[in-house]
Amino acid sequence: MTNNSELLKNLYNAFNPFQPLPAGDPNYVDCQAVRGDADILEELGNRIQLASQNTCQLYSGHRGAGKSTELLRLKEYLEARQCYVVYFAADEEDIDSEDAQYTDILLACTRRLLQELRTMGNPKPVLNWLKDRWQDLKDLALTEIQIEDMNVELQICQFAKLTANLRAVPELRQEIRERVNPHTVTLIKVLNEFLTDVKKRLPANCNQLAVIVDNLDRMVLVKDGERTNYEEVFLDR
């Protein structure tokens, strides 16, 4: 009986959809034949590698179908082909999947990229964007500190506090969106400037940069006016 209980426990945990298999895991089963006959390494990996300009790819599927596992395989595939990959699951630290909007995701991506790549490129364009809006945002970061008095590391920490409050303090969430949303175009502009500089300073064994944002499918559908958050995130922007 004990052995049966242990077996059931192991089986139950083996099928946990919230714990993807790492690339190269011996438990991986190739379900390509019954999942659309498309290999993510060929469909997305080669497209990313061969494109002469920046591309944006959407990888979708049913919950628990193995998307995260496939994306981790894609990460390993790209890294083996001279690509520097930044991978993160958006719902782990930055967004509340029960209430997520485009602005939340943009801020989450900005924070993650700043923290991951700050030593490889010049983050000043993004930090200057934050500095220009700090008087309007510092109360939402729950701080009275003047950003001009901080070094780069502390400035990035303040940006992280702002994004953390999007997830942790629901009563501030809509106010943060309302103050940031008019400036999303300029934030994207300075973020691209930062990434352009990063791409010039990649490690010697890398010649491309890829960003993989996972778990956006866990966002709950929200309709605000005429458009849903899905349409805003995946179509409009």
Label for each model-derived stretch:
Residues 1-86:
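Walker A/P-loop-proximal flanking segment of P-loop NTPase domains
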Residues 220-230:
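Conserved ATPase-coupling elements of RecA-like P-loop NTPase cores
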Residues 214-218:
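Walker B catalytic acidic pair
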Residues 55-57, 61-209, 219-220:
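P-loop NTPase nucleotide-binding core
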Residues 230-237:
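Loop-centered beta-sheet repeat module
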Residues 32-33, 48-51, 168-172, 211-213:
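Short amphipathic alpha-helical segments, especially helix-boundary/capping motifs
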